Regions:
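An amphipathic alpha-helical interaction segment
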Residues: 1-12, 50-52
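Conserved phosphate/pyrophosphate-binding and hydrolysis machinery centered on Walker-type P-loop NTPases
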Residues: 11, 15-19, 36-39, 46
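The cytosolic transmitter module of two-component sensor histidine kinases
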Residues: 18-22, 88
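Terminal helix-turn-helix DNA-binding modules in bacterial transcription factors
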Residues: 26-27, 31, 36, 40, ...
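Short coil turns linking two alpha-helices in DNA-binding domains
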Residues: 49-50, 98-99
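Short hydrophobic/aromatic patch on the recognition helix
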Residues: 52-53, 57, 102-103, 107
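…primarily DNA-binding HTH/wHTH and HhH modules…
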Residues: 105-128
Length: 128
């Protein structure tokens, strides 16, 4: 019986630690999305392998970390387009992209429309 309790406690501690890693990594991504971050950087913060981190992240969050990073960056990009007059190049840089062309391709892939079209559609909504 004591062995079962010990095993339960060890599993609980392990699960809590894994939950902590995931929550801390999501917070890290949100605080550092404008920087050059990747799975290797994040995994090293928690002293785990990139493969293990990616598998754990996908299991807990539902998407791989790179998808989470890119989607979060695009959420922020949409906010910048909605709330500022920054150029596509400026928004790209603020969201961690050094190449505005690559940013535009990623934006269209995730959001569904190119950045300039997104801004036009939303400026119409905001002016009505």
């Amino acid at each position: 019986f004591n062995k079962l309790i010990d095993e339960y406690n060890n599993n609980t501690i392990k699960n809590n630690y894994m939950d902590d890693i995931i929550e801390a990594s999501k917070e890290y991504i949100k605080n550092h999305f404008s920087e050059d971050i990747n799975v290797n950087n994040i995994a090293s913060l928690f002293a785990v392998s990139p493969t293990y981190f990616s598998r754990l992240f996908k299991k807990e969050v539902g998407v791989p970390p790179v998808v989470f990073i890119n989607k979060y960056r695009m959420e922020r990009a949409c906010s910048y387009f909605d709330e500022t007059d920054f150029t596509v190049k400026e928004v790209a840089e603020l969201c961690g992209y050094s190449d505005p062309f690559y940013f535009s391709k990623a934006f269209k892939s995730i959001v569904g429309v190119p950045p300039k079209e997104y801004r036009l559609r939303n400026s119409c909504k905001n002016s009505i």
